[in-house]
Amino acid sequence: MASLARAMLALLALYAAAIAAAPSTTTALDTTPNGGGGGNSSEGELSPSPPPTPAPASPEAGAVSTPPVPPPSVSRRKPPRNNNRTRVHGDKATAHGRKRIVCRERLFSARVGDAVSFGCAVFPRAGETFEVRFYRRGRFRSPDADPEYFDEPPRPELPRERLLFSSANASLAHADALAPVVVEGERATVANVSGEVSVRVAAADAETEGVYTWRVLSANGTEVRSANVSLLLYSQPEFGLSAPPVLFGEPFRAVCVVRDYYPRRSVRLRWFADEHPVDAAFVTNSTVADELGRRTRVSVVNVTRADVPGLAAADAADALAPSLRCEAVWYRDSVASQRFSEALRPHVYHPAAVSVRFVEGFAVCDGLCVPPEARLAWSDHAADTVYHLGACAEHPGLLNVRSARPLSDLDGPVDYTCRLEGLPSQLPVFEDTQRYDASPASVSWPVVSSMIVVIAGIGILAIVLVIMATCVYYRQAGP
């Protein structure tokens, strides 16, 4: 029983020690700022107090020693970072949190001809100046595009680098005076309003595309900070294809136009005849540039069936032309492109025969193998009578027609011109001109000449008869 009593007393002593240690640990946690703790606490933090050692039991009670209770775990957090030390667009903040140069945007993409405005806020320190410079560079060139062949050389480019504005002059008039130096016609102007230095381009073109740099300079001219704003331009082209009519036997022709594209050297163009590639030897290319730098490319193909491998030859009865297709790809930049494609089949005409003659007081015009949509007309627009003579035997689908009109009442020579109208303007003119002389001398001379011919004929006949009679007489009178 004595040993059981000693064990009970030991348990009671252990419980009392645990109760005594709990208040001391709670106080240590409450005095730790920001919830921090641990042996590596920052300056001004309090470490938790260790629990007191429990009192041993009296020898009389036979007390047993117990191990100390470990302190509860405490979370550790790093102090908050100083957000004033940041980098925005490469500009390091000052000690008071203000950056030297702050730009709203760093990249502008605009269409050629549009008005563009951009700028940066500049905060120089005492003794510092700032300026704005322009660098003409960074233009996109597609490696897949075709070379450009100019009918006329483009205008000479201005210097690649120019000063637009400098605060050292402390005058906006200075900026306005420098603007025409960069681009002719005062297309770029600079304004400084309360440290916001903005550039306005009235009509963005090839000479205003590039990099605009804001620079902060120290008193000795050394660059302290700089920021760049890039202006990239584009112009989506217009695409068109035309195929003028041709005469049978002539090369087929088509014209493809890619109008007002930009960047320069950003178009690839190919020709196909009935989906067979056309060799570049049968293609003529030319390029022109407008005042804004936009390009217009004109490509002309002249090809026969024999020039394109794979095309079937056409005989005289088959005037069908191949389908001529123009395909162009415009590269706006290194990742974006647009494809254009259109096909046309030129119309083939057979040459018509037009002739004028005079019959019994009428001028008669004959048109052979004429298209149904065409008609015969006189140059003086005189009233006429049209006759349809039937189909053209050589070329089915074509007609033979005739136009007759009375001769003029005017005395003297008169020209009569008959022309085939209603055909496309690209074809040659089919016409014929004959002259009829209605003067009295010209009219009577045929009668006189006829009488002379008759009299001469009678005289010759009489002479022949006399000779024959003489020969017969002498033959009969012979011995």
From Swiss-Prot:
Tell me where the transmembrane regions lie. Answer: 452-472
- Using the chain's own numbering, where are the disulfide bonds? C103-C120, C256-C326, C365-C418, C369-C392
Residues linked to a glycan: N40, N84, N169, N192, N220, N228, N285, N302
Region labeled Disordered — which residues? Answer: 26-96
**Key words of the record:** Disulfide bond, Glycoprotein, Host-virus interaction, Inhibition of host complement factors by virus, Membrane, Signal, Transmembrane, Transmembrane helix, Viral attachment to host adhesion receptor, Viral attachment to host cell, Viral immunoevasion, Virion, Virus entry into host cell
Q: Where is this region: HDB2?
A: 95-101
Q: What is its main location?
A: virion
Under the heading InterPro entries, the entry gives: GA_GC, Ig-like_dom_sf
Q: What ranges are annotated Virion surface (topological domains)?
A: 23-451
Task: Return the annotated region ranges for HDB3.
Answer: 135-140
Please provide the record's free-text comment about the domains of this protein: The three heparin-binding domains (HDB1, HDB2 and HDB3) mediate virus attachment through specific arrangements of basic residues.
| Role noted for this protein | Essential for the initial attachment to heparan sulfate moieties of the host cell surface proteoglycans. Plays also a role in host immune evasion by inhibiting the host complement cascade activation.
Q: What is this protein called?
A: Envelope glycoprotein C homolog
| Gene that produces this protein | gC
